[in-house]
Amino acid sequence: MTVYHFVGIKGTGMSSLAQILHDMKHTVQGSDYEKRFFTQTALEKRSISILPFDKSNVKEGQVIIAGNAFPDTHEEIVAAKELNIPVHRYHHFLGDLMNQYTSVAVTGAHGKTSTTGLLAHVMQGAHPTSYLIGDGTGHGVENSKYFVFEACEYRRHFLSYNPDYAIMTNIDFDHPDYFTDINDVFSAFQEMALQVKKGIIACGDDEELQKIQAKVPVIFYGFGEDNDFQARNIQKRTDGTIFDVFVRNTYYDTFKITGYGNHSVLNALAVIALCHYENVDVEAVKHQLTTFEGVKRRFNEKPMGEQVIIDDYAHHPTEINATIEAARQKHPEREIVAVFQPHTFSRTEKFLDEFAESLSKADQVYLCDIFGSARENKGELTIEDLQKRIDGAELITDTTTDVLKKHKNGVLIFMGAGDIQKFEAAYVKEVQVAEK
C-alpha cells in the first residue's frame, strides 16, 4: 500500500491536496512545524497524521510531496534522496494529477479563492467534482469528471499546469517582491494562456485581459456590452444580488447569488460562462448559486451584540474597495469600520497612496502594525506613513481593541493576509469579558 507523505502538510495548498488524496481512498500522512495552523482542522477531521519534522518520517515505498517553502536541504528531503525516493514538488504533482480529469484552473490577481469555491459548488450540483481551494480546503471524489483548482501567479507557479480550461478574473500589479511591474505580471498570464488546452473564460472589462493571445477560444464576460456573457439589470439587495445574463446580446436567464458587490457578480458570471460552455444544466447552476455559503476568510460575517464582524483576506487596495462596497450593499444604514493590517513592507510601500484611498471609503479606519514577511528587509517604512494619509485613522494593537466598542451599531471589517485574526479574537474576547 502506497503512503503519500507531505513535507509541510499545513501549507494551504498542501493541506488541500492531502485531503483530496485521502478522500480518494489513499493513505496520507505529513509533517510540519508544531505550531497550530488553521488548515489542521480539516486534516484532523479526516484523521490524517501530522508529525513533527524528522528524517525518520521518510521511509522506502512512500511517495514524497514537498511544499515549495522547503528547500532541498530540508532534513526530510535529504533523507528521501539518500533512500533514492523521488521528491515531487507540490505544483508538479498537482499538474500530473489533474490530467486524469477535465481540469479548470481559476487564476487572477483577485477573486481566485472565491471563484474557485463558487465554481466547485456549482459544478458539484451537476457532476462529480474534485476541487482544491487556496483557503486550505480540498475535496476528492473517486469518480470525478471535473477537477477545479486555484492557480496562483506568484513566482509564476501556475506555469506548472496545462489545464483544459482557465478562468482569468483580472490582471493587476501585486507581489512587488517578485514582479517588477504590470507588464511582468501580464507576461506571466500570457504564458499561462498558451498552456490552456480547450478554452479561456476571461473578464473582458479588464484592459490587460483584453490583450491576451491564445491558441484556444477566449470567452469574455463582464458588464460591458462587448462581452460574450454580459450581466444586465443588476438588483443589489440586502439579501444578495439578482441579474440577467445576455449571451452575445441575447437574453439567456436570470440568476440570484448570495454575494454582494460588483466583484461577486463578475465571479458568478465567470462560473455561468464556463458551465454554459460545458453544457451544464442551467437549472442546476441557478440552484447552486443560491446555496453557496462562501469560502474561508472571504467576507465571513458574524453578529456580535449590536455590531457585525466581518473577517476578510483583503490585502490589496482593489480587494479593500470590493470588500467595503459589499459591506455597504448588505448594510446600507450602518457605520462601516475598517480594521486593517498591511501585509509585507514591499506591498505597503508600493501601494501606500492606493491603500489610503481605498481605506478612506470606510467611515472610520484603524490600522495595525505592518505584518512583515520573513524574506524581506523592513526598511524605513512604518504604519504611521499610512496613518498620516488617512483622515482620522487611529492605530490599534491587540491590547487596545476595546476602542472598537464605541461603534455601537457598526460593521467592523477585519482585513489582512497576516495575523489580523489575532486582533479580531482579542476584540471578541474583550466584548465577552465585558458582558459577564
From Swiss-Prot:
Subcellular localization, as worded in the UniProt entry: Cytoplasm
Binding site for ATP: G108, A109, H110, G111, K112, T113, S114
Keyword field: ATP-binding, Cell cycle, Cell division, Cell shape, Cell wall biogenesis/degradation, Cytoplasm, Ligase, Nucleotide-binding, Peptidoglycan synthesis
GO cellular component terms attached to this protein's record: cytoplasm
Taxonomy, superkingdom: Bacteria
Pathway in which the depicted protein is active: Cell wall biogenesis; peptidoglycan biosynthesis
GO molecular function: ATP binding; UDP-N-acetylmuramate-L-alanine ligase activity
EC category name: ligase
E.C. number(s) listed in UniProt: 6.3.2.8
Biological process, per Gene Ontology: cell division; cell wall organization; peptidoglycan biosynthetic process; regulation of cell shape
Catalytic activity: UDP-N-acetyl-alpha-D-muramate + L-alanine + ATP = UDP-N-acetyl-alpha-D-muramoyl-L-alanine + ADP + phosphate + H(+)
TM segment ranges: none
The UniProt record lists the keyword Cell division: yes
Family label: Belongs to the MurCDEF family.
Main function: Cell wall formation.
HAMAP family the record matches: MurC
Name the UniProt record assigns to this protein: UDP-N-acetylmuramate--L-alanine ligase
Provenance organism: Bacillus cereus (strain AH187)
